[in-house]
């Protein structure tokens, strides 16, 4: 039960995307991997899941993933600035080089 495991959804709510409808669910599962001394258990995987889903939503909406995120970070200039800087430094929107290892 999520009420018993407060860290289950850790990292899933960290990004403050303005989503008009959002619901998170937790289904407990014993996968046999002890996590007692694993630092940042849920924060190490949940943000990846959230961002992957944001990519899927952007594709479904037919919108560039960076533009989609910026739209849902409205009113959060610091977060928008970080995303814009990451996109610029990562050369987002530029074609990939036609060299081995890039395709």
Model-derived features with residue positions:
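Glycine-rich loop/linker segments at domain edges
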Residues: 1-52
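N-terminal leader/propeptide and maturation segments of large enzyme subunits in energy/redox metabolism
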Residues: 30, 34-88
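Generic recognition of flexible, low-complexity loop/linker segments
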Residues: 55, 92-94, 103
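Short, intrinsically disordered, charge-balanced linker/junction segments flanking boundaries
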Residues: 70, 96-103
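Structural signature of cysteine-dependent C-C bond-forming condensing enzymes
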Residues: 86-97
């Amino acid at each position: 039960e999520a009420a018993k495991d407060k860290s289950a959804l850790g990292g899933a709510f960290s990004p403050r995307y303005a989503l008009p409808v959002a619901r998170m669910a937790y289904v407990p599962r014993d996968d046999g991997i002890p996590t007692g001394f694993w630092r940042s258990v849920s924060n190490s995987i949940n943000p990846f899941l959230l961002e992957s889903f944001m990519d899927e939503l952007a594709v479904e909406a037919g919108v560039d993933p960076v533009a989609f995120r910026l739209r849902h970070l409205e009113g959060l200039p610091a977060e928008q600035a970080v995303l814009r800087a990451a996109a610029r430094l990562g050369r987002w929107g530029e074609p990939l080089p036609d060299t081995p290892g890039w395709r």
